[in-house]
Swiss-Prot record:
Keywords, in A-Z order: ATP synthesis, ATP-binding, Cell membrane, CF(1), Hydrogen ion transport, Ion transport, Membrane, Nucleotide-binding, Translocase, Transport
InterPro entries: ATP_synth_asu-like_sf, ATP_synth_asu_C, ATP_synth_asu_C_sf, ATP_synth_F1_a_nt-bd_dom, ATP_synth_F1_asu, ATPase_a/bsu_AS, ATPase_F1/V1/A1_a/bsu_N, ATPase_F1/V1/A1_a/bsu_N_sf
PROSITE patterns: ATPASE_ALPHA_BETA
Protein name: ATP synthase subunit alpha
Keyword Cell membrane found: yes
A family per Pfam: ATP-synt_ab
Entry's EC annotation: 7.1.2.2
Taxon lineage: Bacteria, Bacillati, Bacillota, Clostridia, Eubacteriales
Record site feature (Required for activity), residues: 362
CDD domains noted in UniProt: ATP-synt_F1_alpha_C, ATP-synt_F1_alpha_N, F1-ATPase_alpha_CD
Residue positions binding ATP: 169-176
NCBIfam families in alphabetical order: atpA, PRK13343.1
Gene Ontology molecular-function annotations: ADP binding; ATP binding; proton-transporting ATP synthase activity, rotational mechanism
Compartments, record wording: Cell membrane
Length: 504
């Protein structure tokens, strides 16, 4: 290539004019120790708590321990190929996850990356994983019901939008089943559901996703999965990531339901991380801030004020107990953070009462305001009558003669217990719950044999749907049982009862 001498001078002049003196500075550090998913890094002077740190091989870490001479980082990926002496860089960003409508119907990991084989999540919006909870002024009181479709819960332990209701019980007592039924019951109610699986078996998560897909619930559900094979840092991040995804919809004025399954495994993952970071252990070897770990997560559930759009985030955290011991560290912590608890007992479960809700020690501290008036009218005495029945049942085991009133109460109690039984994946619309509870509480079932109650319930709904279709509509419209509606209900139940008893 021949360049003329006069061209050379113009090229040099051009280069000098376009010469860029910008210097790019990168905050970097050196790994001085690595192992067990923890890296100690020297030289990151102005690092933030919770900042993303870039490691070799496209692996990111999170700065958790800011010490005088080094920074303790947890790795959010595989540590293979990363060794002492490697250079790491600051990103000057905290951990964030993708949010938006594109996530609905997807299964993602703790960092929002898809793991369902359906291609990338097409969204440009992200949100920090750790966000401060809304303040007192930004909230309004819980006053709208969130129906679970489970008779025992909607009647005695009602949940409102924006509430945090703990589901607590031993393993294999139906905790996840209650959460799943609640998700299924939100179909067609414009509620976004998020199921966060923490430390579960991969087969269990696959089974849940399969069931949700089969029932058509994945159309409004996001599944965030951090299974038992994931590292402790990823399990630790999962609920915060799910919460951020839910907050996006809450700030858009929508109602969101989020299930954390379960926070016991979350605390164990955090304990693992803390001990590896050499933080001092406390009770049951958990670190001192394990209460704050869960309180800052659950406080993010709220019903926002109308000024902020009036959206809500309702949380159903799940905690597993050992041999029914609710006085252990994590259960007592979460009980004191939440607005009530649904306590499930293995004795009731094994006795065939499913859902195995112990109505005696289960409470809802704020949901009563959210209950519709019609449900309050039928369920007002339910808890008391069940408690009296249990007491009488225990007393009658001694074989002593009971007076007529006590026998009547026992018979009514047996039917109430039978009515509160419900199969899994069978959530019930609120108007049907009210109809059958009205029948049970007002002694309409006293002459129906206990073993025929389930059959009676099923056929009663069919009868009312055929002959008294307007009853359900009236309940939903007025949200209370007027005298006219009560007499209509009494007539419908008595008409059907005469037909039913004549066929037995």
């Amino acid at each position: 290539m021949n360049i003329k001498p006069e061209e050379i001078t113009s090229i040099i002049r051009q280069q000098i004019e376009n010469f860029n003196t910008n210097i790019e500075t990168i905050d970097s550090g050196t790994i001085i120790q690595i192992g067990d998913g923890i890296a100690r890094v020297y030289g990151l002077e102005d690092c933030m708590e919770g900042e993303l740190i870039e490691f070799p091989n496209d692996v990111y870490g999170m700065a958790l321990n800011l010490e005088q001479d080094n920074v303790g980082c947890v790795l959010l990926g595989a540590e293979e190929g990363i060794k002492e002496g490697n250079v790491v860089k600051r990103t000057k960003k905290v951990v964030e996850v993708p949010v938006g409508e594109a996530l609905v119907g997807r299964v993602v990991n703790s960092l929002g990356m898809p793991i369902d084989g359906k291609g990338p999540v097409l969204t440009t919006e992200t949100r920090d994983v750790e966000v401060p909870a809304p303040g007192v002024i930004d909230r309004q009181s819980v006053k709208e019901p969130l129906q679970t479709g489970i008779k025992a819960i909607d009647s005695m332990i009602p949940i409102g939008k924006g509430q945090r209701e703990l589901i607590i019980g031993d393993r294999q007592t139906g905790k996840t089943a209650i959460a799943m039924d609640t998700i299924l019951n939100q179909k067609g109610k414009d509620v976004i559901c998020i199921y966060v699986a923490i430390g579960q078996k991969q087969s269990t998560v696959a089974h849940i996703v399969n069931d949700l897909t089969k029932m058509g619930a994945m159309d409004y559900t996001i599944v965030v999965s951090s299974t038992a094979s994931d590292s402790a840092p990823l399990q630790y991040l999962a609920p915060y990531a799910g919460c951020s995804m839910g907050e996006y919809f809450m700030h858009k004025g929508k109602d969101v339901l989020i299930v954390y399954d379960d926070l016991s495994k979350h605390a164990v993952a955090y304990r693992t991380m803390s001990l590896l970071l050499r933080r001092p252990p406390g009770r049951e070897a958990y670190p001192g801030d394990v209460f704050y770990l869960h309180s800052r997560l659950l406080e993010r559930s709220a019903r926002l004020s109308e000024k902020l759009g009036g959206g809500s985030l309702t949380a159903l955290p799940i905690v597993e107990t050992l041999a029914g011991d609710v006085t252990a560290y994590i259960p007592t912590n979460v009980i004191s953070i939440t607005d009530g608890q649904i306590f499930l007992e293995s004795e009731l479960f094994n006795a065939g009462q499913r859902p195995a809700v112990n109505a005696g020690i289960s409470v809802s501290r704020v949901g009563g305001n959210a209950q519709i008036k019609a449900m309050k009218q039928v369920a007002g005495t339910l808890r008391l009558e069940l408690a009296q029945y249990r007491e009488l049942a225990a007393f009658s085991q001694f074989g002593s003669d009971l007076d007529k009133e006590s026998v009547k109460r026992l018979e009514k109690g047996k039917r109430l217990v039978e009515i509160l039984k419900q199969p899994q994946y069978g959530p019930m619309p609120v108007e049907k719950e009210i109809i059958i509870l009205y029948a049970a509480v007002n002694n309409h079932l006293i002459d129906i044999p206990v073993n025929k109650i389930k059959e009676f319930e099923k056929e009663l709904f069919n009868y009312i749907d055929t002959h008294y279709r307007d009853i359900g509509k009236d309940i939903l419209e007025h949200k209370q049982l007027t005298d006219e509606l009560k007499s209509k209900l009494d007539k419908a139940i008595n008409d059907f009862k005469n037909v039913f008893l004549s066929e037995i």
